Amino acid sequence: MKSRRQNVSVARQTILGRDENFEPIPIDLVIEIFSRSPVKSIARCRCVSKLWASILRLPYFTELYLTKSCARPRLLFACQKHRELFFFSTPQPHNPNESSSPLAASFHMKIPFDGRFNIISPIGGLVFVRYEQILKGRKTPEFVSAICNPSTGQSLTLPKPKTRKRIWGTSHFGYDPIEKQFKVLSMNIGDGVYKEHYVLTLGTENLSWRRIECSIPHVHGSKGICINGVLYYRAKADMFSGTLMIVCFDVRFEKFSYIKILKPTTTLISYNGKLASLVWEGPSYICGKRFEMWVLGDPEKHEWLKHTYELRPRWQNVLGEDLLIFAGMTGTNEIVLSPKYPSHPFYVFYYNLERNTIRRVEIQGMGAFKVNEDYIFLDHVEDVKLI
């Protein structure tokens, strides 16, 4: 990393001005200053000079910024207004003892669409989006797949897999922490099950799909979650079967396996680095006075550990009359609940498993937008790496 260690004396006029009394600033110090700057400041600094732009593109800097961002995760919101999808984020409160002051949402980017859209669970600072769009020369909308980075405002349209199947099933987004690779898994339907499975690896010179084999007949049933390099998603044996399972896809080795589940699951979450399932006694929204969390013990033996949580009656004063759904779980083991029918003012709720306490946090700055309850994501990080 010789270029990182050199001094900026050759470009002092760009960084320090023309005053010869100043000593040149080491690149390491410049990088450290930038790593503490807000993500929007990074975008502006890229336009100041070629030297600054080159510094902010160094792999060392982007990795350093990402590492620091992981220590301050954010809530990511996808909001719909007319035919545009807007991305906002707020700091994610991680200290159960801190006061629940209102949080101001920051706008990042928007995506136009012409029909339906679907957001696959984001990973790190990247978001995988599928949306309908009327392409040039066409009269009807077609689905487009894209990888977006809300922090930089960039998006990358993915090529379509070459397949004869007309009925496309679903897609998932995974990350291999060993090889540090993002991968997209896509499947299409034939005879009631997924017949063809394709993988695309991001970061390669030529983006292309590779067909892989899967020996487990299944059809998709829920959004997935990637934990420690394994992508999990709920599925059925076929479109007409009531047999449920959780399919496991090893992102690095691109191999499939499955886990039996004892109860229908509402939300898959990560609990202390393990797969867990939140189960409510009733519909998909929260009702009643208790819920269960099933934590995967031994995946090879299909063993689950059951935890039951009782809701205190006085919580009704905090929750109000809203119907709530599970949005996920934070790294500090707080379950995040969001309204099924968002209103103004807009709140999210944090339930602490260890303390058996709940707090309400107001989110400001999105009043003019429709917040879709299915598109509130936890542990989003700001990534300044350009796509």
From Swiss-Prot:
Pathway it works in: Protein modification; protein ubiquitination
Keywords for the protein's UniProt record, in alphabetical order: Abscisic acid signaling pathway, Ubl conjugation pathway
Record-annotated membrane-spanning stretches: none
Knockout mutant characteristics: Hypersensitive ABA response of stomatal closing and substantial increase of drought tolerance.
Any one Gene Ontology BP term: response to abscisic acid
UniProt free text on domains: The F-box is necessary for the interaction with ASK proteins.
Protein name: F-box protein DOR
